[in-house]
Structure formats: C-alpha cells, structure tokens
Swiss-Prot record:
NCBIfam families in the cross-refs: lgt (TIGR00544)
Similarity section: Belongs to the Lgt family.
Alphabetical UniProt keywords: Cell membrane, Membrane, Transferase, Transmembrane, Transmembrane helix
Protein name as it appears in the record: Phosphatidylglycerol--prolipoprotein diacylglyceryl transferase
Protein localization: Cell membrane
Organism whose genome encodes this protein: Mycoplasma genitalium (strain ATCC 33530 / DSM 19775 / NCTC 10195 / G37)
C-alpha cells in the first residue's frame, strides 16, 4: 500500500513505525468498551467478572474475524502482509461482527444459564384463600438482553475506527468528474465546506490529482447518528422489546454499508461486502420482527402450548404417529388448556428483562428472610 507520509504517528527505536490506523482503531475499541461498561453498571446494574472477561474474548474474536474476512473478500492488504500485521489495514469489520456474534451466543448461553447468574425476585403468592406467602422466583437473564447491551457499542467503535482509513488513505469513493487539478471549482460545490471546516480531510482526499468522495467521513457520521439513536434513545421508547435494540444495530450497519459500498473506488470494492450487508439487513428485520411480535408471545404460556398443540395436530394429519392414540391426544389437549389459562398475563418488567419460556423455579423463604420481608413491607407501607 502506498501510504501518505503522515500515516505514521511515530517510530519506536527508530525502526518500528506505529501507524495512525492502529492507534485510531485501538481508540475505537476502547471507547466501545467504555460505553459497554457504563451501560452494564449504571443502566443494567450488573457487576460480574464474567461480563468483563467477555470483553477480552470479544476484542480477540473481533480482530480475528475481521482479519479472516479480509481474506474471504479478497483484500490485497491481507495477502501482502503478515497475518498479525494489520497496522497497514486489512480489517473487515463485518467478519469481526459475525465471529463475535457466534462466540457471544455460545458464551452467554452457557454463562447466563449457570446457577450463579440467575436473578431472584421477591414475589407474593396467594396460598389457599387469604394467606399470602413471600417467595423467591428464580429466572434466567435472556441472551437478547446481552445483545441489546453489547451491539450498539460496536457502532461508536466503527465510527471512530473509520478515521483510521483516512490516515491510511484507503476506502475512499470514486473521483468526482471535472475535478482534475481544479480545487477552486470544487470549493464552490457541496464539498467546499471541507476546505473550511476540515482542511486536512480536504487535502487528503485529493488523490492522483482528483478529489475522491470521503466515504470514511460519511460512514463515520451515520454510524454516530445511529449510535445515539440506538444506544440512548431506543431504551426510552415504550413498547420496545428486548432484542430489538440489538437487532437494530444489524439493520443500521447493513443499510449504511449497502448504500456506501456502491460509491467506493474500484480498488476497494468487494462484491462480498454487498452480499454481507444484505444479510445484515435481513437478519436485522427478521430479528426485530421476532422480538417484537413472536418472542413476546412465546413467553406467554398460552401461545407456547398453542404452538405445541398445533404442531402435534399437523404431525397427526400427515402421519399416523398419533392417529391410533386418541387418549394421548386428549391428554395433550387437556394439558394445553390447563397450563395456558393461569399464565396469560405477565408484567412489563418480566416481558422486558426475563425472556423465560419455562416455568420459574420457586423457593420458599426461610423464617429469617420472612422477617426481613415483613420489615421491608412495614417500611414501604408506613
């Protein structure tokens, strides 16, 4: 790669150059981690070393996936450099997102289902007619909640990291017609503001005597806008179910990349990136639809048993598996009605944070815990 002279930040020992690309990408990763930790502690009120351990895993898988994806899409930076030498570029963020998503699903499914990471809430159950008994209800935290927590933070990391492409003078757009060695003519167009507000960007986008569209700047701008909307605003929108925020990230980054990829210079154009962007959009739309309309019904036991019962009916229609056992079908139908009736309604808090699809395990309070509960009840009602 023919890098500009100002792409090197400094040299170590006089012979090992440290590139601005690596520094800026590192800053983007650190800033994304800070946003993750902030929401983890102050918004979700979760503090556990296992969450911080995932940060270490995510950084490694993000870099590894991005590096491998450069090979998949045919990036010349991958072929011309050592695998671990990505100071000169060769990181495709889409691959990092894919690999980290897979690892995250595996990690959090194991981690959140462990006994030490179940949440307990005090509930009141009516025993007999008039006796109220306090109990602990133990639930699993949904993986979708973790998706809401982590995914939006990646956007701000991408927004910052895109500036590394500027210092490497890569991932720019095609040349604007009629700009050959004529900065004054371009200064009177819509890109003239760069000459005043960002003179370094203005100078850096003149490549081979022609002005190139600063795609890094455009993508960084829209990534920042979507980050603010998804990270700060969507949590306050009534009716947004868990998982919707996380899948909104896939939809947003897919749309941004799909539009901007078509304006890239042919040197940096990869058809695989177009396909991956479409995949992200499809995953985002299907994920949002599932979280908003399907998953919330599956959490309602009525709909869970309804789908199970419907499945058995369809299976019985096409096969003879259940046709000769009418008694079994009758028992299933009775269980379907019996289990669905007392569980039709759930609180918004449960629907938002505890996507449990199985019956919660109930623990009776000890006498000491019961006394504490009575004291708390007396304080809150006085």
């Amino acid at each position: 790669m023919n890098r500009p002279s100002w792409s090197t930040a400094f040299n170590i020992g006089g012979g090992f150059p440290i590139q601005w690309y690596g520094i800026i990408v590192s800053i983007g990763i650190i800033f994304a981690i800070l946003m993750f930790v902030f929401k983890l502690i102050y918004c979700y009120k979760l503090q556990d070393n296992s969450f911080y351990f995932f940060i270490f895993i995510a950084v490694l898988t993000m870099v590894l996936g991005a590096r491998l994806w450069s090979f998949v899409i045919g990036d010349s930076n991958f072929a011309n450099n050592n695998f671990f030498d990505f100071r000169n570029g060769g990181l495709a963020i889409q691959g990092g997102i894919l690999l980290t998503s897979i690892v995250g699903v595996i990690y959090f499914n194991f981690f959140l289902n462990s006994k030490t990471n179940k949440t307990k809430t005090i509930a009141e159950l009516l025993n007999n007619k008039n006796e109220i008994k306090a109990v602990y209800v133990e639930r699993n935290i949904s993986v979708l909640v973790m998706l809401d927590l982590i995914a939006p933070c990646v956007l701000i990391g991408q927004a910052i990291g895109r500036w590394g492409n500027f210092f490497n003078q890569e991932v720019y757009g095609f040349a604007l017609a009629g700009t050959m060695n004529d900065p004054q003519a371009l200064a009177n167009t819509q890109w003239g503001f760069l000459k005043i507000l960002m003179p370094k960007v203005w100078d850096g986008m003149w490549i081979d005597g022609q002005f190139r569209i600063p795609l890094f700047l455009i993508e960084s701008f829209f990534n920042t806008i979507f980050f603010v909307l998804i990270y700060f605003v969507m949590d306050f929108i009534r009716g947004v179910k868990s998982g919707t925020i996380g899948f909104s990230y896939f939809l947003a980054t897919g749309i941004i990349r799909l539009i901007l990829e078509n304006f890239r210079d042919q040197t940096f154009y990869f058809q695989t990136s177009i396909t991956t962007s479409i995949l992200f959009i499809v995953v985002g739309i299907l994920g949002i639809f599932y979280c908003q309309f399907i998953h919330v019904k599956l959490r309602n036991y009525f709909w869970t048993y309804f789908f199970l019962y419907a499945f058995y009916k369809v299976a019985a229609f096409f096969t003879t598996l259940f046709l000769n056992n009418r008694k079994q079908m009758a028992q299933q139908k009775f269980a379907f009605y019996e289990k669905s009736l007392p569980n039709k309604k759930r609180s918004f808090f449960e629907m938002k944070y505890y996507n449990d699809v199985t019956t919660p395990k109930i623990y009776r309070l000890t006498d000491q815990e019961m006394k504490l509960f009575d004291k708390l009840e007396a304080v809150t009602t006085s």
